[in-house]
Amino acid sequence: MKENKSLHSMAAVPLEALVKEEYRTYQIYTLMDRAIPYLQDGLKPSQRRILFTLWKNSNKGLVKVSSLTGLVLTLHPHGPASVEQSIVNLAQDYTFSNNYPLIDKKGYFGERMETQAAAARYIECKLGKVAELLLFDDMNQVVMVPNYDEKVMEPVGLLPKLPIMLLNGAEGIGTGFSSVVPSFNHEDIIKSMISFVETGKIKKIKPYFRYYTDKVETDEKGRIITRMSFKQVGEKIFINEVPRGYDSSKIYRHLNKHMDNDFLKDYIDSSVDNMINVELIFKRGQSPTLKEVETTMGVISSIVPNYTLITEKGVKVFHTPEEILEVFTVQRVLVTKRRYELLIKDYEDRLMKNNEIIRFIKEKHYAIAEKKANRKDYIDYLSKSKFFYAEYLADMAIYRMTKEEVEKRLLLIKEETSALAEFRKILKSPALLKQKLVDELEDVGKKLSAIMDEKEKEKKRVFAKGGTVKPPTTRTRQ
């Protein structure tokens, strides 16, 4: 019996090389598929899949977070816990979460002092008005690929009108890389983009955290600093702002430390939603000044920006937010140009279709249908008669074979011819293309401001009705 040498012909692979290759594969996977946001749309894959799923199911209105999780898992090859948390994160709107939440919510999704949301089966959400405004207008340009099991299609990247990672900030840690992108104000972003389009010069933008009432500082090392601030009302002193990363448990630990040091006797936390209001109670006979309290109890929090993003060529580290804006604005110019190319193609097709309908009616090709054996023979006849839209014409109802239909199509041809001429004029002129982008940015700015103003009014209406007000919390040393 001959030995099968092929069983032993595989070359030996050193263990070190095998481990390095597997580590590299895992590194690429964590970066590209989980941890780091993409430059094109500012989203991580899980966030993109959530928003795309909501967009496809937007006619359903509010859906349970648990139900949405199940829908997203058809695209996302990971467990439900991470998807549920990503949904909650996209919907949260308290200070230091999202300046512009992409998901509208119903139920308790957490607040500034108590960030933990209710269970997924008790809370509901839908695609947010911000996402509707920014994300889905250019879906005919979005590249679609099969999902992980090749059963449905999903987008490689969306084409937002503004950079989402700069609007809401982004954080992620992958193998060998991390990303820490602070958030910025949409008005500053839009002004900077318009400046770059019109003059080629980008305007600097400053970090912005919605509802944060103190000054956001940047030190000489580039760290972004937020701090605890105090106010005095009569003889009482209150904490009225806390740094990034401080929730109730961290604040209480900080206050309890000062109680242990006998600087503080007690405190009453009356904070609600984004409004921080913690009354400090000192021992009888102790009346520290506001300055003394700030010096003794004040704390700061800092973040070091790290603008690491995924690009078409892989991982890229940007040095400033303005550098990201430059690349993103160039992308928007190309998207605007492609939009008009597609519009021209669409209107050319419309003109051809309307002209064929007129010829079909005037030459009475519909009368030939009764002489054909079946629909296929009739379509073959129309195709031989040089009708490109033969199938559409074969399905036209007989009541439309009238002068009225011809007149309607002639009117459409006039309108479409005029629009087509305008689109071609814009496409041929770089200046007009840039102006269209500027007009779009200005329009987006107004609409986004209106959306956020309406959200603020709605929040005030809820508070006026006593919707989410919690009772003051008194914390005392045991």
What residue spans do the PLM features occupy?
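Catalytic phosphate-handling regions of large nucleic-acid enzymes and associated NTPases
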Residues: 1-223, 279, 474-478
